[in-house]
């Protein structure tokens, strides 16, 4: 049953109907459409469109429909309704007869879909935050278990300074914490109810929109009807948050792929998140991480698509806006799946402590410590930087580490070097000295872990 047939003298061509209909994807808004319809029925009582008895009858029927939807949402797709709004109204009329035709009084599909998608987005934010928080908890647990795992830290993918695997884990805790807080910010901005805005100019019935907003668990009603039905900022914002978080996940995945390589051998991924080769029997491929990395472009593509869709639209509603749903549905599903998979990857991750330490001892990652040592002896840092650079070249030529050089060898480059230099060149000293807040010293990392465990409890 179409909701708009009276104006037309010819039926829509099947080709157009197939092109125009959205039930195949907006069926996911069924629960929200029913929720909004129950709220609207209560508002209509207050403006004398419905009696209390009629509203109770409608609410009972809508709740029955809600139970049916929750038990088998895919059954909706067997219908040929244009969209989820048409489907809900049709099923309601089947249950209560002509009374069901009164429900749409004063309401447009424009404000109806606007409230549906906001309700859906609000629920998804809550679910996504729980997934992100769960990933953070797993990162913190992994950090707690790997505080003694010294490894190289990298810049430009070159060994730079020693860190611990725990410090690496806690870096991602911080990234995902920003994603979590962005979801909170987005939730607060989208927590406004557009229902009662009509097609664009507001409803002709004196509906108490503030009361309606509270009934539907919104903070307050939107302030401008024209903006209310054309606003898709919340979708763009969620797509933006998803895209940025996927970039964080992609970096996590890339690190894991590198750490898991035979050349690095820092970690071993579980058999349960890897796959083999159809030709090469020895292969164990990090497919979970590669798919996380690969799906990032898919989510970013949804953001780009939505921005381009909106950029030239005149006020207020345009059918172009129907294109908002498939992108947001797919992007948030993909994001949550990737967050959950990253959590699963951490579950049985094995860190090769011996190998990470061996790698940390190579690459002259203690060179900065030698420069700081010279500064402590009164050498200006810029001079000490140059001196250490020359010392490293010498050590490379001799096939030695800095800690293996003799005092006479050190003094070829600076006379201030004494026997106390060896103490500061050890891995432990390199870590311990980074004791400012946020640094890699074991004390600071332990503090960060304890603070995060308290925060995420």
From Swiss-Prot:
Its EC number is 4.3.2.1. One of its GO terms (biological process) is L-arginine biosynthetic process. Keywords: Amino-acid biosynthesis, Arginine biosynthesis, Cytoplasm, Lyase. It is an enzyme of class 4 (lyase). Pathway: Amino-acid biosynthesis; L-arginine biosynthesis; L-arginine from L-ornithine and carbamoyl phosphate: step 3/3. Belongs to the lyase 1 family. Argininosuccinate lyase subfamily. This is Argininosuccinate lyase. The gene is argH.
